Amino acid sequence: MNLRLELTRFLSLGYVLSSSFMFWMGLSLFTDCHSPIVVVLSGSMEPAFQRGDILFLWNRNEKNNVGDVVVYEVAGKSIPIVHRVLKQHYDRSTGEQLLLTKGDNNNGDDVPLYARGNYYLNKTKDVVGTVKGYIPQLGYVTIWISENKYAKFGLLGLLALSSLISSED
């Protein structure tokens, strides 16, 4: 075992991980979204977006218009929701924009999904971003890995095996 070679591999791995992290943080700053890329997890927005589509978000617009597709998070729930703005108005006391959303494939609006006692989303507090682009079906890989525990272990095993194979000279 060559210590210098092992340290070089370790540093290369650290470089790749830190570069990936910095890219994600830079993208987050550029788009003003803590999660600038999300995967559609349900069919509530069909036919516009299918389960497994990857969405690219932008949160630098001052307001959202009726018809915009937004991603929002509700306090106490960890999964972001992708739905279309159905109505919008402004709070008279604060001047903040309030939004009512609905999934294209749903029968009713999203009020039952909002935090208890809220009938609208607050644009600045609840909305993660507005959808500006997408790649169809590419997100199925992440859905498959997250829903299949064997896939997680298999992927980790493949990574470990590849590092063992590549370390043998």
Swiss-Prot record:
Lumenal side: 30-169
Membrane topology: Single-pass type II membrane protein
One function term, GO molecular function aspect: serine-type endopeptidase activity
Gene Ontology BP terms: signal peptide processing
EC number: 3.4.21.89
Cytoplasmic side: 1-9
SUPFAM superfamilies: LexA/Signal peptidase (SSF51306)
Catalytically driven reaction(s): Cleavage of hydrophobic, N-terminal signal or leader sequences from secreted and periplasmic proteins
Residue positions with a glycan: 122
Self-association and partners: Component of the signal peptidase complex (SPC) composed of a catalytic subunit SEC11 and three accessory subunits SPC1, SPC2 and SPC3. The complex induces a local thinning of the ER membrane which is used to measure the length of the signal peptide (SP) h-region of protein substrates. This ensures the selectivity of the complex towards h-regions shorter than 18-20 amino acids. SPC associates with the translocon complex.
Protein name: Signal peptidase complex catalytic subunit SEC11
Name of the coding gene: SEC11
